[in-house]
């Protein structure tokens, strides 16, 4: 709306919004910035890397998941070798609240409970949990979890009711307050997890994006496969032979798999030019999913996974945290990286002795009136709302998935303060709105 401000800079425009007087566009000389980024990203991984490195091994006897090992460092108040920049938090101060209170694994607890309250403000869209990840990808269970905590020493299945804590559906699992060692016994918001900003895997995948943008396809593929080999524990799931848009799409997806819940995906989508397209795709998929749940009792994804309307759950004796799933037929171990800490051993008040949640039917359809369902109920399992609640609340979900996008031509608008330099040089033509400062 003020073209004279841009001087000789030219833009490639995807779409425009006359009402908001804005455009979804990129500079025509964007590859110059890719070249600059390539130099800095390569240095961050080599000459300027210092002691930082991708965590590719796991020395723990009870787990073999280098991806999770990175996050465990942070929960133990240590600096991971993979961390490049984090905002430091101090234990037992309110400034430490973000990943131990706002964004971690959901809990109904309060202060000094088992465990404390966690709002779980980051949720995974169910279609991505069920239909996005390869079932062999070790990142899925570390990144997202289907059970939360009641604050009284017990694990319990999340609901898809609109809400927080144990409502709201599948949530971020990279930071689980139960896994802190030593466990923080104190008031909520005080566990002291640092706030992550950038890590080595992020840099590797940004460099892959840059390489693909500069047509260095072989190098881009090699970078992506570094991340995939860690995620799967082998090279059998490596990508190969991709170029052009197919390669760029693969890199975009890899960043989603790797960086879920770390604050990158929306900006990745904006930068890719696919924000509005992806928003409409996921909403359409969720609409179809909800309809199938209502009419068929389940929804089947292209990878063969099934999201059912109901699951069967049972509280079982003991209190243990689980790790990589070694037996998918064990209803306590599958999916992995859930369970509950034995809070009674810490002297905290707990309810009962059956603290772990066994789940049957999470990835398959069990007809409620079937012989299988009857057998499970005879064993003490309880028919539990799962996808049925999601279907009943689908309008709430659809209105909150990338809101404001109404078509693939919509312009995604993010409001950032206009820098003082721009305001001062605009001769009064540019000002910050929304109550933002002018200087």
Q: For each predicted feature, which ranges?
A:
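Extracytoplasmic/secreted proteins, especially bacterial periplasmic and envelope-associated proteins
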Residues: 32, 36-39, 43, 135, ...
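Structured segments of extracytoplasmic/periplasmic soluble domains
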Residues: 40-51, 207-213, 223-234, 250, ...
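Generic secondary-structure boundary/loop-capping signal
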Residues: 81-82, 141, 195, 233, ...
